[in-house]
Amino acid sequence: MTANKHGFEPKTEFTIGGIAFTVIQTGEDWVKCIASECVEERAFDAKNRNDFAASDIRAYLNGEFLRRLIAAGAPEEMFEYFNIDLTADDGLKTYGGDRVRVGLITCEEYRLFREHIPALPNDWWWTATADSPINSFVRYVSTDGTLYVSYAIDGGGGVRPLCNLKSEILKSYLSGGYEKQDAPEDQREKAVDMMKHIAAAWDIDAEEVFGRADE
């Protein structure tokens, strides 16, 4: 794991937009963090789709939830786009990948960074990983930390948002010295992000239209 030049380390906890987050991975100028607790309970998808890219939970996290953080004072420029590998738990790569500003942890990431993730002995919570494209199950983390499955339509699943944050802005924000920059927003990336979600929702091969998320 790369050391962060702004001093953030795994297991560091801080509050942004009224939500407590814990660092699980560091890069030189960014940190990946997960909500320290479940922020709410909701279905992965009301239509029982287990493809994160097409899901209601994905739309919620990158829409209403992100707007709520920003409205509570979190700098919008702090949230980086990052890739999510949507390989299913059975190894099938039907769902490809996705690119988001707020996501959910995958099963592979959970295994890799488990020691940095606060345990929740009273809640179970969704991952972004489908059990298989041939069913409607989504993998989730149980109260004892093991991985199980539930239907995507299950409304009792906990939500622990995952973010990649620019650590320079994060440090300034936490110290109270952040001032919004006047640099123009990347409207093209936002538009592509929206179109990819629409394509996934309508079962269009987004990779053929926009290219792979990891390119």
Model features per residue range: what roles?
Residues 1-189, 194, 200:
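Collagenous Gly-X-Y triple-helix signature in extracellular proteins
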Residues 203-214:
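Short, charge-rich amphipathic interface segments used for partner binding and complex assembly
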